């Protein structure tokens, strides 16, 4: 049994690519039957790889997607995944390969192993920063100024930047 990793994705790109990605993912959500038999159902990541023309045997697919949405001008798709152990970068890179105009930002967390990762270092699309204090204490902040204030209070010295 794996530790489950929760990842939020924001795909940004031109309208044609974003709309096509969204329509394909939405068709999987709305389908009465899974493309391929699996233990996750219609939103299994292997179905997503398959509908995009890939081979689910070659790309990590142990998980599912949900919370699919698109912005009003069709340039941003958001979705979340639950996957085994960590963020599936090969899946993310495969989607970006299929849609050359698309870049996918992610933020992932697998608390069992203390894994936290993101490629949105400026918190432009996924504004949530995690600070861990000890083994069980975690705090989430929307921006670095809040993190600096928290750390300043903890150590008794003013912090204003990462330098």
Q: What are the language-model segments listed below?
A:
Residues 1-163:
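Intrinsic low-complexity, intrinsically disordered or marginally ordered coil/linker segments
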């Amino acid at each position: 049994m794996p530790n489950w990793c929760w990842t939020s994705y924001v795909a940004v790109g031109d309208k044609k690519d974003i709309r096509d990605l969204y329509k394909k993912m939405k068709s999987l959500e709305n389908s009465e039957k899974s493309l391929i038999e699996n233990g996750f159902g219609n939103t299994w990541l292997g179905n997503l790889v398959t509908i995009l023309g890939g081979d689910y045997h070659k790309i990590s697919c142990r998980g599912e997607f949900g919370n699919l949405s698109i912005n009003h001008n069709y340039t941003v798709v958001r979705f979340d995944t639950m996957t085994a152990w960590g963020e599936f970068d090969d899946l993310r890179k495969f989607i970006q390969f299929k849609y050359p105009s698309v870049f996918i930002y992610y933020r992932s967390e697998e608390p069992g192993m203390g894994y936290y990762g993101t490629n949105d270092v400026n918190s432009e699309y996924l504004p949530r920063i995690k600070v861990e204090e000890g083994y069980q204490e975690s705090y989430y902040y929307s921006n670095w100024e809040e993190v600096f204030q928290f750390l300043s209070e903890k150590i008794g010295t003013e912090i204003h930047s990462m330098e």
